[in-house]
Amino acid sequence: MAVVAAAAATGSTTRSGGGGGEGTRSGRKKPPPPPLQERVPLGRRAAWAWRLAGLAVLLLLLALLALRLLRHHGGAGGDAGVWRVALVCEAWFAALCALNVSAKWSPVRFVTRPENLVAEGRTPSTTAAEYGELPAVDMLVTTADPALEPPLVTVNTVLSLLALDYPRAGERLACYVSDDGCSPLTCHALREAAGFAAAWVPFCRRYGVAVRAPFRYFSSSSSPESGGPADRKFLDDWTFMKDEYDKLVRRIKNTDERSLLRHGGGEFFAEFLNVERRNHPTIVKTRVSAVMTNAPIMLNMDCDMFVNNPQAVLHAMCLLLGFDDEASSGFVQAPQRFYDALKDDPFGNQMECFFKRFISGVQGVQGAFYAGTGCFHRRKAVYGVPPNFNGAEREDTIGSSSYKELHTRFGNSEELNESARNIIWDLSSKPMVDISSRIEVAKAVSACNYDIGTCWGQEVGWVYGSLTEDILTGQRIHAMGWRSVLMVTEPPAFMGSAPIGGPACLTQFKRWATGQSEIIISRNNPILATMFKRLKFRQCLAYLIVLGWPLRAPFELCYGLLGPYCILTNQSFLPKASEDGFSVPLALFISYNTYNFMEYMACGLSARAWWNNHRMQRIISVSAWTLAFLTVLLKSLGLSETVFEVTGKDKSMSDDDDNTDGADPGRFTFDSLPVFIPVTALAMLNIVAVTVGACRVAFGTAEGVPCAPGIGEFMCCGWLVLCFFPFVRGIVWGKGSYGIPWSVKLKASLLVAMFVTFCKRN
C-alpha cells in the first residue's frame, strides 16, 4: 500500500486543535446564534398520502396471502405444491413491503446554512467571513487498480479536494491518497500534480471556480471572451492554466512504468509491491493521518469522484456542528451523483429515487447509511467511541490504565496512542510544524502486521470481513448510539462516474450483494446490534431491507419460474379471470407499479427512468443477486472464497475517450461472464412458455382442463419478456458486444432444456 500525503496549499500543514467556544465572557446574556441547519419534515398531508399508498399495497399483498390460505390449492386437479411455492414467495414480498413502509414512514431533510457558520460565541452581527476555529479535516482518497482507475482520474479528484473553500485551508485541510495496487504511475502522477496544484488552487479561489476538477472545468468551458482589463487578466490566467493542465496530462500519459522502476525510486516501489499491498487501504489512511495531522473530521472519497460544490466542507460543518448534541451527527453522507449521467438511467445504477425517498425516510429514524464515499466522519466515531463519552481517567502517565487500554485497542505506537487519546477526550493536539518528522512513524503504523492483536478492523476503524465494509462500518457507528445525516446541497457536493454497460453494472451489483449477504449471516447482523447494542429497531429494519437485497433472488427467481412452469404443465398459480379472487392480484399489480411510478415522478424523474429501473431490478435480481447468493452460500459451506472485483471507472476523466466510434452508451452490452446466464435462460424460457401456451390456445388443446393456465400466467410471462427485452434483443438481433455470446446462449439453452424436461415429467 503506497500512501501519499499532500498539503491543501503551499506551505506547511500546521494544525490547530479544533473548535470550541469560550463561552460568555461578560455577565450579559448573548442572543442565540443563528442556526447552522434546519430540520424540514415532509408536509403532513403529503406524508400521510405516501403512508396510505404504501399501506394499500401491503394490504393487497396480505389479501393475496389470505386468498392462498383459504383456497389451499388451484382447484380440482391442481398442484398444491405450486400454490405453496407462490405462498412462500408472496409472504417474502409482503415482509419486504412492510419493511419499506416502516423505513419511509417519517421522511426528513436537512437544510444547511453555511452563511451562519461564524466565529466563536456567534452573534447576529457577526459577519459570515468570521469562521472562528473550525475543525481540521483529513481527506482520504482510495484507489486500487491503475488500469481500471487511471492515475489521471485520481489526480483530478485530489486537485478538486485541495481547492476546497475553507478558512485557513493550508492549515486545516490535508489530503491522503492510498493506492492498493501500489502503482508507480499513480505516485508519479501525484508528484506531478503537486506542482500544478500550487497554481491551480489560487486560480480557483481567485475567480470563484465552481467545478474544481480541471478535466471537468476545461471540458465544460470554452475559451472565455475578454471585455476589459479584469476580463483580460482572467483570460490570460485561464489560458495559462489550460496550457499547464495539458502539459500535466501529457507528462502523466507519456510516462512508462518500467522506466519509473528503473530510474528514481525502483527500490522503493519494489519494497512496497512485495510488502504493503496486503494492507487495508482505509484503515492505513486512518492510522497514517492520525500520526501526521490527526484532524477530528475525516472525509472519505473514491478516486473517481470530484468536488462539485467548493463549499462542501462548510455545508458538512453545518451538520456536524449544528446540533446541540454531537450524537446527532456521527457522520454526514452526501448522496452519490454522477456527471454526464446517461439520460433516464438505462442501467438502474444512479439510485436517485433510493436517496430521495428511502434514505430521506431513514433520516427520520437514526440517519443515512454510510455509502463508502463522499462521507464526513467524526474520527471519534470511527475509533469506536460512543457519543458524549466522558473518560473516567485522564492521567498523563504512560502507566495509567487508560494508556494500557489505548495500547490494547490501537497498538504499540506511542504517537498513535497519543493522537487517539487527544481525539477520544477532545484534547487539543499540538500543532505540527513539520510533518516530515512523522514519516518514519507513519511507515510503522502502516505496516502489514501492525493491527495484529489490536482492535483495528473490528472495533476501531473501518470493519474488516466484508466486500461492503461501508455498510458494516456505518452500522457499527449507529449501533454505538450515533446518528447520521444526509447532506443535500445545490449544486451536489460531489460527482462521480457511474458504470455503463452490462458487464460493469452487473459486476458492481454482484459485489455489493455479496458483501450484503455476508453481513446478514455474520455476527454483525443488525438484529443482534438491536438486541445487544444501541441500534434502533426501525433502523435495524431499514438495514435489513438493504442487506436483504440478495436474499430476494431465490424468491424472485422461483416466482418468475412459476408462470412458465404452469403453462408448460397446464396448471395455474393465479385465480382465473372468471373467478372472484382474480381482482386481488390484478389490483396488486396495478397499485404497486402505480405507487412505484409516482415515487419516481415525485423525485423529478421521467416515466422512462421508472421503467428502466423497474426492468433492471428484475434483471439484477435474477443475475447479480442470484450469483451473489450462491457465492455466499458456497463460502459458508467452505467451498469457495469471495474476491473483491474493481469496477472500471469512466476514462473520460483521463482524456482516453477516443474509442467511442458512434457506440450507444445506453444500450446493454454483454460478454461471457456467468452473470448473464440466468437472465438469458429465463428470457428464453418465458418465450418458449408463451409460444407453447399460444399454440395450445390456437389449437384448442387446453380446453376442458380445469386447472389450465389463465390470463394471469400469460401476463406474468409477457411482463418478464418485456423486462428482459435487452436480453431478447441480444439473443436475436445483437451483434458484437451488443449480442449475447454463443457460450452464454448454449449454457442458457441447456438450462432451459433441463427445465422443460422437468416440466414434462410433472
UniProtKB/Swiss-Prot annotation:
GO terms for cellular component: Golgi membrane. GO terms for biological process: cell wall organization; cellulose biosynthetic process; plant-type cell wall organization or biogenesis. The keyword Transmembrane helix applies. Residues 1-39 are annotated as: Disordered. Pfam families: Cellulose_synt. Gene3D superfamilies: Spore Coat Polysaccharide Biosynthesis Protein SpsA, Chain A (3.90.550.10). Its main location: Golgi. It is a multi-pass membrane protein. The active site is at D180, D470. The keyword Transmembrane helix applies. It comes from the Eukaryota. It is found in: Golgi apparatus membrane. Its EC number is 2.4.1.-. InterPro entries: Cellulose_synth, Nucleotide-diphossugar_trans. Residues 1-15 have a biased composition (Low complexity). It is an enzyme of class 2 (transferase). GO terms for molecular function: cellulose synthase (UDP-forming) activity. Keywords: Cell wall biogenesis/degradation, Glycosyltransferase, Golgi apparatus, Membrane, Transferase, Transmembrane, Transmembrane helix. The chain crosses the membrane at residues 47-67, 81-101, 541-561, 582-602, 619-639, 673-693, 708-728, 739-759. Thought to be a Golgi-localized beta-glycan synthase that polymerize the backbones of noncellulosic polysaccharides (hemicelluloses) of plant cell wall. Belongs to the glycosyltransferase 2 family. Plant cellulose synthase-like H subfamily. This is Cellulose synthase-like protein H2. It comes from Oryza sativa subsp. indica (Rice). The gene is CSLH2.
